[in-house]
């Protein structure tokens, strides 16, 4: 799995970042936007491999901002970063689920409403979406009528489902409000009154629509999943043979959810309510789902039936930034952190009992000791300091740690390595770099950051590539102890970024030697 998915995903990460640098070299030329459009196409393709490639977008947006803004400021950089986050959200929470959502509405209309066969609504939706994209590109290219240009753009955004965030009626209300606000902003009369820097030009709209079209074309690779499932192959997990089951497949609903910003701890108890004299757990439903109705006769028309969506329990005790949330991993959490906790009252249907909850400091300690240190920095140091062996560890001093090859440092970290048995000493995964790549990377990092105004801009580009493909993934995954395998493959993009600093370190050393030692450049 790792070789098939993450190697391909790493390729997309490298190519997309290289392409934005190619664009930077020719940004002032007439047809430079084609590099941006190619990036959009590869981003759409990469969605069919893994969503990790979307994490390159903040770095890409910074490159774009610094190139287009000679006198860039910290405020402008922050706005560009916020814009990049909106862009990631528009793809991740807009286009990816939105196409399925709006396609599902068309499917229900044509199958349940008009009595047509399965997938007829999806076919009509795809045709309309393609027509809207082509119309929008044409109108923004010709610039014959600004009103039609705005209408075609808004129609495309609506058909993509980007404004319809959430579930049920609330998503429709949000979508209508967003579309209304966008329509007001793009109205020709409003565009004529606002400052020029905030106007949406035809070129910007055309490029945005072309990029959207390329993302959709790349994203359409998921059609293979539906075609394969329709053939009823022996391996057909979730059977995504229609737009609704495809939505569950894309949402990875079989894996459940993990709390990120606010949620329960491992010792939290389900909130209870008394109803008709019975004590029942409090639950919430995440919308509803539609499944194909089994026919009782061949003459019966195709139709979908509505079923309750995913049901989740609500907990009485919650905390911010919950890192220790899994009740099935409670003993393992206690191996990583000495949890004293604190007692909080819990209403057990009229009976008050005390529940011991980990405090916020213990929660943060687990985040730093396990999730950040063991599940990220350990892998980072494997690549730039050294690796003890390739035996998966769970915190033991003899399995899978990072080392340097420098005895007095390794003795402090994991003990005397000379005392290990021969099978561990001679492990083929054993490798030491004496921290030389790490030192070069740190030199490159500081040299780039303090070299010049151009250098600090380049530093922030590389930093956000490093952060978003590394630590940001750690924050999002919220991993539990005792993972089934080592997860170093997920952070390859972050190691790419630090490798750039390693190369910068070599350049920095040469520059420093040239400056301080008056070293002359040798002839080629």
Which residues does each PLM region occupy?
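Multi-pass, polyprenyl lipid-linked donor-dependent membrane glycosyltransferases
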Residues: 1-15, 33, 46-49, 55, ...
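Short hydrophobic alpha-helices at membrane interfaces in multi-pass membrane enzymes
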Residues: 26-44, 73-86, 145-157, 523
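Lumenal/periplasmic acceptor-binding loop at the mouth of the active site in multi-pass
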Residues: 229-445
């Amino acid at each position: 799995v790792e070789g098939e998915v993450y190697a391909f995903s790493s390729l997309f990460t490298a190519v997309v970042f290289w392409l934005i640098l190619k664009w930077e070299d020719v940004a002032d030329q007439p047809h430079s936007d084609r590099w941006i459009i190619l990036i959009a196409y590869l981003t759409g393709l990469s969605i069919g491999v893994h969503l990790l490639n979307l994490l390159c977008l903040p770095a890409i947006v910074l490159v774009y901002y610094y190139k287009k803004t000679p006198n860039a400021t910290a405020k402008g950089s922050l706005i560009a970063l916020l814009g990049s986050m909106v862009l990631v959200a528009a793809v991740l929470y807009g286009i990816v689920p939105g196409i399925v959502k709006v396609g599902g509405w068309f499917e229900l209309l044509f199958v349940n409403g008009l009595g047509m066969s399965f997938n007829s609504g999806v076919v009509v939706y795809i045709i309309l979406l393609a027509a809207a994209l082509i119309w929008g590109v044409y109108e923004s290219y010709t610039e014959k009528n600004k009103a039609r240009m705005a209408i075609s753009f808004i129609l495309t955004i609506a058909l993509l489902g980007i404004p319809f965030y959430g579930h049920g009626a609330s998503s429709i209300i949000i979508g209508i409000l967003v579309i209304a606000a966008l329509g007001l902003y793009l109205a020709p009369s409003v565009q004529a009154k606002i400052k020029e820097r905030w106007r949406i030009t035809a070129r910007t709209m055309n490029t945005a629509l072309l990029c959207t079209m390329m993302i959709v074309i790349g994203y359409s690779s998921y059609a293979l999943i539906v075609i394969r499932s329709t053939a009823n192959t022996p391996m057909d997990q979730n059977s995504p043979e229609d737009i609704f089951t495809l939505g569950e497949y894309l949402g990875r609903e079989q894996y459940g959810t993990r709390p990120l910003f606010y949620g329960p701890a491992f010792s939290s108890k389900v909130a209870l309510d008394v109803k008709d004299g019975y004590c029942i757990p409090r639950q919430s439903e995440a919308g509803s789902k539609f499944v194909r109705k089994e026919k009782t006769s061949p003459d019966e028309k195709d139709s979908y039936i509505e079923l309750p969506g995913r049901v989740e329990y609500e907990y009485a005790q919650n905390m911010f930034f919950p890192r220790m949330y899994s009740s099935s991993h409670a003993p393992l959490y206690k191996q990583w952190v000495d949890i004293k906790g604190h007692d909080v009252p819990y209403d057990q249907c009229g009976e008050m009992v005390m529940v011991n909850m980990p405090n916020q400091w213990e929660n943060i300690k687990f985040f730093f000791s396990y999730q950040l240190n063991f599940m990220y920095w350990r892998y980072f140091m494997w690549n730039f300091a050294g690796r003890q062996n390739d035996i998966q560890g769970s915190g033991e001093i003899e399995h899978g740690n990072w080392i340097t090859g420098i005895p007095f440092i390794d003795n402090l970290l994991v003990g005397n390595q000379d005392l290990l048995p021969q099978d561990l000493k001679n492990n083929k995964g054993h490798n030491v770099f004496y921290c030389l790549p790490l030192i070069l990377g740190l030199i490159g990092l500081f040299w780039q950051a303090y070299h010049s105004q151009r250098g600090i801009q380049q530093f922030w580009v590389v930093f956000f590539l490093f952060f978003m493909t590394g630590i940001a993934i750690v924050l999002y995954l919220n991993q539990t102890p005792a993972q089934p395998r080592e997860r170093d493959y997920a952070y390859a993009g972050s190691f790419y970024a630090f490798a750039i600093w390693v190369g910068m370190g070599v350049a920095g050393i040469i520059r420093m030697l040239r400056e301080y030692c008056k070293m002359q450049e040798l002839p080629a």
